[in-house]
């Protein structure tokens, strides 16, 4: 196969060592992104993930920083083991996926019965595609998570965590596949990767006169004091299950979970929801009898399918109760007297700032919710829930004044202790589907090793670390805060899969999300550890914490002491990490674990500084999924469009934290724009403008603004904003300039800096043009980022351009009204001097009376006082940028309109344009001349 153009350029960059970062006297910038799990081919969704840090890394290098952007491969866990097993068993779906979608040759596919072969094949493919994309990665630091050196690093990490009491053994809830009979992680799933495990309190409501117990699941046991009734779904078939000698009424879904979480759970009967309506149950905390009523908002797949109603604090309950009051015929259908519902009134349990006595009803009103089926209910529920959790205090007698958070735990403990409640674990969202196709459950594993994320002190340190971090976008911070708050103990090891054995219990393997929390520290020394094999924990104690005697440690590890000290110096240079980038679905696990583990293992001066969260990739409007075949492989996109087109599309289609949608039609549009850009540079980069008029200076001022805005946007990872401005924005400026001047010679004045601005996003094209067209010998990455101060700052010209654009619109409107034929003379009347004086006074925040008093000193103006007053009133509505000087604007406007006259004749029917700076002395109808204003000239079409 012939060498692709980008391959030659990449080799030149690689030979020049452009991306290899070593400590020096420059300020460092260290950026990492989640390393890939190479179990399949790279698609364009992955490409966006790695493009964002690459753009930022290139940008910061050009600003003069020493930038480290490394990469590795995550191969821990069971996914590739499962894939190898399925291929070995001849599973057609798996074989078809790898042969037909990923294009794996038969001779390679035959080797895929071994998980190592899968990892090696796709790691090679990933690296090749990353190079084709031009990612500026320091590949010297590459590793896999099963390398002996990395396993030594994980061993050190877990010994340290155990020393701190943060790893323990006991019962623990995990995502579990009943078919595979194994816990599952994110990489093991076809669907439901975002689902977390949540603990629910099961409140028991005994049915009066029966041995049945309606069991309601809740996150908010503290609200039980405000329960008015219990809801069931009329057409749902509930199960009667025996648990510890009690007969519970729950949904089929709850039964599936309970079987995996408790011993001896047996299904003994069924009962339809409609059979339960009208029964009375007992509130275990108040002893009151509560009616069982019908509700449609219940989703039996979540919780138990039974809900106790607290209309004062739960918007869905309030809406459902009001629905029944508005339409009592529903009750009559089930033989319930409507008066039962009429008598139900909300009971306040919690007081919270910003809400009245019944927050749920406030939320219904605020969101305009009128029924229990309104989709806004979920949002309203979350708002009330969060407000009451963080700011609410109890108002019920026994707990009056107690914060909700404290009361919740106390009430839950009492209910469980008295036998009136139990606990069940469930997923935050469903379905959760294993790669084998089975729906997963939450299972309690016994004798399981887990990380104690529930530890109060650890949570506090994690919260402190988060508080110091910059989060992009900022609104995601609340998700991190919530996750730290609810995150419970996490099963950190499994019996099977690839990875690092627990050092004190080697039958267990550290699972993927637990061995990928602080590897950013490992990158700093990864290239120095290659080939060193297993290392004692003391090496990492010294490198990362400065603990121990380097000579003794070096001797024990078989290292040179200079080598060990160089590792310590390198870590000290690069840490703390500046930016960690990853997808939004990892906020509730990996990214929060990353915060916890840094808080536990490293001193505060080494805590990471920032996180950027990505959105998801869509293909023609549908979520990308390799397992479902709904992807565009990156290799195919690169073959068809080339790297710069792919990069520019991914960069400008959405901000990093937004979902982007890959559509071939749009990508082809980007391709056409990029071809036009290259043509412009090749045709006009060597041109220049000698005597620059107002239009030339306008263009250069606007380019100054482009440089400033692009720089600002890139600093904040606003990649789309940056390159919509720097690429499409400048292309638009050139079109507007050409419309006014008839050429684009001005391009030669900005060509160098434009290529520099665009280099982070389209490095291949810009580097090629830099050398071939501009004749430079250097690489653009070695050049300095453009300095906006090298361009004129004349904001008045931007205003003048806006005046011109509006003037053209006004002329076209008049043409339509009077039916003007092409060939007329266009007279443009600029406002008289006194109006400019009035505008200046107004912009100095002078009151109307002060402005009039100043103007009335002019005898000529006094004679037409009413007219002047009317015009001054008009001018008070004008708004100008603060940095615009009125005198300069008046001068600039005259000069600009004269220089841009071509646009007026090209875009209107005028054959000639005459600009009058003094309308009183100019020819033409008086009413046309009198209509002139500073920012809106008067016009007359002389036919």
UniProtKB/Swiss-Prot annotation:
Residues 915-930 have a biased composition (Basic and acidic residues). One of its GO terms (cellular component) is cytoplasm. Keywords: Aminoacyl-tRNA synthetase, ATP-binding, Cytoplasm, Ligase, Nucleotide-binding, Protein biosynthesis. Its EC number is 6.1.1.4. A motif ('HIGH' region) lies at residues 36-46. Its main location: cytoplasm. GO terms for biological process: leucyl-tRNA aminoacylation. One of its GO terms (molecular function) is ATP binding. It is an enzyme of class 6 (ligase). Residues 910-943 are annotated as: Disordered. It catalyses: tRNA(Leu) + L-leucine + ATP = L-leucyl-tRNA(Leu) + AMP + diphosphate. It is found in: Cytoplasm. CDD domains: LeuRS_core (cd00812). A motif ('KMSKS' region) lies at residues 623-627. Belongs to the class-I aminoacyl-tRNA synthetase family. PANTHER family: LEUCINE--TRNA LIGASE, CYTOPLASMIC, LEUCYL-TRNA SYNTHETASE. HAMAP family: Leu_tRNA_synth_A. This is Leucine--tRNA ligase.
């Amino acid at each position: 196969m012939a060498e692709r153009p980008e391959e030659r350029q990449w080799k030149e960059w690689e030979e020049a060592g452009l991306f290899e970062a070593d400590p020096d006297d420059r300020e460092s910038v260290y950026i990492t992104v989640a390393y890939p799990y190479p179990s399949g081919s790279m698609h364009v969704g992955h490409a966006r993930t790695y493009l964002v840090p690459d753009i930022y890394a290139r940008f910061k290098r050009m600003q003069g920083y020493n930038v480290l952007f490394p990469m590795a491969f995550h191969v821990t866990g069971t996914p590739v083991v499962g894939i190898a097993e399925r291929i070995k068993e001849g599973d057609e779906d798996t074989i078809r996926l790898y042969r037909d979608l990923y294009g794996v040759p038969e001779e390679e596919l035959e080797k895929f019965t071994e998980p190592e072969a899968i990892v090696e094949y796709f790691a090679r493919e990933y690296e090749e595609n990353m190079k084709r994309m031009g990612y500026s990665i320091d590949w010297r630091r590459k590793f896999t998570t099963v390398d002996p050196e990395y396993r030594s690093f994980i061993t050190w990490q877990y010994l340290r965590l155990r020393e701190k009491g943060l790893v323990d053994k006991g019962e623990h809830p995990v995502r579990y596949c009943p078919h595979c009979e194994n816990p599952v992680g994110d990489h093991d799933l076809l669907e439901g990767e975002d689902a977390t495990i949540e603990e629910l309190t099961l409140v028991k409501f005994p049915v009066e006169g029966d041995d049945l117990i309606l069991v309601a699941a809740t996150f908010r046991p503290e609200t039980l004091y405000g329960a008015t009734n219990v809801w069931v779904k009329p057409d749902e078939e509930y199960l009667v299950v025996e648990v510890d000698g009690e007969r519970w009424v729950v949904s089929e879904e709850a039964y599936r979970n309970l079987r995996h979480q408790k011993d001896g759970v047996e299904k003994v009967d069924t009962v339809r929801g409609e059979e339960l309506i009208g029964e009375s149950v007992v509130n275990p905390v108040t002893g009151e009898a509560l009616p069982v009523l019908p509700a449609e908002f219940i989703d039996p797949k979540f919780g138990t399918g039974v809900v106790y109603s607290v209309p004062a604090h739960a918007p869905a309950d309030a809406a459902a109760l009001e629905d029944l009051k508005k339409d009592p015929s529903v009750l009559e259908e089930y033989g319930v007297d409507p008066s039962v519902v009429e008598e139900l009134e909300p009971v306040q349990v919690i007081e919270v700032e910003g809400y009245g006595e019944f927050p749920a009803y406030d939320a219904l009103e605020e969101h305009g919710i009128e029924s229990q089926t309104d989709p806004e209910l979920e949002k309203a529920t979350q708002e009330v829930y969060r407000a009451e959790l963080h700011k609410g205090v109890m108002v019920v007698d026994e707990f009056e004044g107690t914060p909700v958070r404290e009361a919740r735990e106390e009430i839950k403990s009492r209910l469980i202790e008295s036998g009136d409640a139990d606990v069940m674990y469930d997923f935050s969202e469903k379905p959760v589907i294993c790669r084998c196709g089975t729906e997963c459950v939450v299972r309690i594993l016994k004798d399981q090793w887990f990380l104690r994320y529930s530890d109060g002190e650890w949570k506090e340190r994690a919260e402190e670390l988060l508080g110091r971090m910059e989060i992009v976008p900022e609104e995601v911070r609340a998700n991190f805060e919530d996750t730290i708050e609810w995150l419970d103990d996490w099963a950190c090891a499994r019996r099977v899969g690839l990875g690092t054995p627990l050092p004190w219990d080697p039958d267990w393997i550290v699972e993927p999300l637990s061995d990928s929390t602080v590897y950013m520290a490992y990158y700093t020394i990864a290239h120095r550890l290659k080939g060193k094999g297993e290392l004692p924990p003391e090496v990492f104690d010294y490198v990362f914490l400065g603990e121990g005697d380097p000579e003794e440690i070096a001797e024990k590890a078989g290292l040179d002491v200079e080598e060990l000290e160089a590792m310590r110096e390198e870590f000290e240079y690069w840490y703390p990490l500046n930016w960690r980038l990853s997808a939004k679905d990892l906020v509730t696990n990996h990214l929060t674990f990353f915060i916890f583990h840094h808080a536990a293992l490293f001193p505060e001066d080494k805590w990471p500084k920032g996180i950027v969260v990505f959105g998801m990739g869509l293909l023609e409007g549908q979520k990308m999924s390799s397992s479902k075949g709904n992807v565009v492989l990156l290799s195919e996109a690169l073959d068809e469009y080339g790297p710069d087109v792919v990069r520019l599309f991914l960069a400008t289609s959405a901000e990093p934290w937004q979902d982007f949608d890959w559509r071939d039609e749009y990508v082809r549009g980007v391709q056409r724009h990029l071809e036009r850009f290259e043509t412009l540079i090749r045709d006009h980069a060597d041109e220049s403008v000698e005597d620059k008029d107002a239009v030339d200076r306008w263009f250069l001022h606007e380019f100054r603004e482009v440089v400033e805005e692009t720089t600002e946007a890139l600093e904040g990872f606003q990649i789309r904003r940056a390159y919509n401005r720097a690429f499409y924005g400048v292309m638009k400026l050139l079109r507007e300039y050409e419309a006014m001047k008839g050429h684009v010679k001005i391009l030669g004045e900005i060509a160098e800096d434009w290529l520099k601005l665009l280099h982070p996003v389209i490095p291949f094209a810009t580097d090629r043009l830099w050398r071939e067209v501009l004749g430079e010998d250097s690489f653009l990455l070695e050049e300095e980022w453009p300095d906006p101060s090298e361009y004129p700052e004349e904001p008045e010209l931007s205003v003048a351009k806006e005046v011109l654009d509006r003037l053209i619109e006004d002329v076209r409107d008049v043409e339509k009204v009077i039916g003007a034929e092409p060939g007329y003379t266009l007279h443009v009347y600029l406002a008289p001097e006194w109006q400019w004086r009035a505008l200046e006074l107004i912009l100095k925040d002078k009151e109307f009376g002060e402005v009039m008093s100043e103007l009335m000193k002019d005898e000529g103006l006094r004679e037409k006082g009413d007219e002047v007053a009317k015009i001054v009133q008009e001018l008070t509505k004008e708004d100008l940028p603060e940095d615009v000087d009125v005198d300069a604007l008046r001068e600039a406007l005259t000069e600009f309109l004269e220089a841009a006259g071509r646009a007026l004749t090209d875009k209107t029917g005028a054959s000639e344009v005459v600009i009058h700076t003094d309308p009183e002395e100019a020819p033409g109808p008086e009413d046309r001349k009198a209509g002139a204003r500073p920012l809106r000239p008067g016009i007359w079409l002389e036919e």
